[in-house]
Amino acid sequence: MDLTLWTYEGPPHVGAMRIAASMQGVHYVLHAPQGDTYADLLFTMIERRGQRPPVTYTTFQARDLGGDTAELVKRHVREAVDRFQPDALLVGESCTAELIQDQPGALAQGMGLTMPVVSLELPAYSKKENWGAAETLYQLVRGLLKQQVPAEPKHDPKRWQQQGRRPRVNLLGPSLLGFRCRDDVLEVQTLLTMHGIDVAVVAPLGAGVEDVHRLPEADLNICLYPEVAESTCLWLERNFGMPFSRTVPIGVGATHDFLVEVHTALGLEPPSPQEGYRRSRLPWYSESVDSTYLTGKRVFIFGDGSHAIAAARICSEELGFQVVGLGTYSREMARPVRAAAKGLGLEALICDDYLAVEAAMAEAAPELVLGTQMERHSAKRLGIPCAVISTPMHVQDVPARMSPQMGWEGANVIFDSWVHPLMMGLEEHLIGMFRHDFEFVDGHQSHLGHAGGSGASQESALSDVPEADEGYVVWTADGEAELKKIPFFVRGKVRRNAEAYARQVGCREISSETLYDAKAHFKA
């Protein structure tokens, strides 16, 4: 067990709460002590919802452990059913309650309730939040549809042609506390409608029990978020023969591939590759002279699997960036992330220790970081611009306005979010030229991605560190002053080159002259 101040994912019962809160008419009875009710704040403070999640806690205390906690579970189940009258009931336990082995799901299933009861067994000490969300959705769909499973799974995704209607698809995976899920659903619905494709059911976000029963009526399932929906899509494919799309439409290229995959599966003519150029501003800008100075920028990417893989493709294929680091905290997505990293000549970082991620980030020395809320903090300490691309996130990454990541408009949002921190670097450099003015000190810099005074003080402090080994070099005062004249977004690269040159020629101090010599050496 590790003691930490940050975790990328909560325990699996938080994932179950996300599914219950995303749906209509579903209630979750959670066997948990009083201290485990903190998760409510995630929905009211981060997601900024107007209502609490539909969760009833048993809230047992230490004195209850000497009595019959099983009866406590039954009482809370009855009270929840009488009060909320749900269409389906989820019953599970938190990480703490798992230790006392009350098996609340089995207790609830033996109470003879009239609505479907889904027992959730979520191993809190080996699995985490995204797995818990995926398992909850899978168990709920499986429990509600088990009576509808045909003897032989026969499903023709092109049957809409014989039935004289438009093709229908299900969007699976969007949930509360997902990254821009609400906006992604609206954007993908708009995108599909433009191509003559109707959306039958969106689940779990906004879906009810009756909607789940209608899932097999669609022609195709679309797996928008593999972390949450892939296991459900695989079950529907095995038992109902329903195919599903595997391309996540984040970025111009991925959106086009997504449309081609969906159209091909439904028997429609694939759209033109030029559609992205007409609908999104990203392709034009990345080919324009204005973006030339952004070409080759070093980018470090870390987040959930789907968004990290999509970001790597956008950076390498659409914006001309150089990906110098790629990783995820989601072990369930380790295989596709490793494959994406291998295609870029990298070794993927599969890790849920934020300190190890920060160390890898510092070693890669990127000029832009794309990550989670924690990478924003780490990048700020290192003086590197950052954009958040994935959960976990803070309230500023849950905008009230529409801000999707998927589809053509999502590509525009990504274009703004990722390029602006680098564009702001030019302004910071100009401000740095007027450093003597009291209004333009390091601590007053204008965007969150820059470390400000802490970054500058960290750099100057390096010159005060005593000699550690033979390869250690020291920066003189005039060398540091000259280094500060270089724009911050390439300063790290210049520092590394100068130190490498000094070691190569046997110089123990780096002055302004050494810096000029290093510049000439690497340009030769």
UniProtKB/Swiss-Prot annotation:
One of its GO terms (biological process) is light-independent chlorophyll biosynthetic process. Belongs to the ChlB/BchB/BchZ family. GO terms for molecular function: 4 iron, 4 sulfur cluster binding; ATP binding; metal ion binding; oxidoreductase activity, acting on iron-sulfur proteins as donors; oxidoreductase activity, acting on the CH-CH group of donors, iron-sulfur protein as acceptor. Gene3D superfamilies: 1.20.89.20, Nitrogenase molybdenum iron protein domain (3.40.50.1980), Proto-chlorophyllide reductase 57 kD subunit B (1.10.8.550). Binds 1 [4Fe-4S] cluster per heterodimer. The cluster is bound at the heterodimer interface by residues from both subunits. InterPro entries: ChlB/BchB/BchZ, LI-POR_suB-like_C, Nase/OxRdtase_comp1, P-CP_red_C, Protochl_reductB, Protochlorophyllide_Rdtase. The active site is at D290 (proton donor). Component of the dark-operative protochlorophyllide reductase (DPOR) that uses Mg-ATP and reduced ferredoxin to reduce ring D of protochlorophyllide (Pchlide) to form chlorophyllide a (Chlide). This reaction is light-independent. The NB-protein (ChlN-ChlB) is the catalytic component of the complex. The gene is chlB. Its cofactor is [4Fe-4S] cluster. The keyword Lyase does not apply. This is Light-independent protochlorophyllide reductase subunit B. [4Fe-4S] cluster binds at D36. Protochlorophyllide reductase is composed of three subunits; ChlL, ChlN and ChlB. Forms a heterotetramer of two ChlB and two ChlN subunits. It catalyses: chlorophyllide a + oxidized 2[4Fe-4S]-[ferredoxin] + 2 ADP + 2 phosphate = protochlorophyllide a + reduced 2[4Fe-4S]-[ferredoxin] + 2 ATP + 2 H2O. Keywords: 4Fe-4S, ATP-binding, Chlorophyll biosynthesis, Iron, Iron-sulfur, Metal-binding, Nucleotide-binding, Oxidoreductase, Photosynthesis. Its EC number is 1.3.7.7. Pathway: Porphyrin-containing compound metabolism; chlorophyll biosynthesis (light-independent). Substrate binds at G425, L426. SUPFAM superfamilies: Helical backbone' metal receptor. It is an enzyme of class 1 (oxidoreductase).
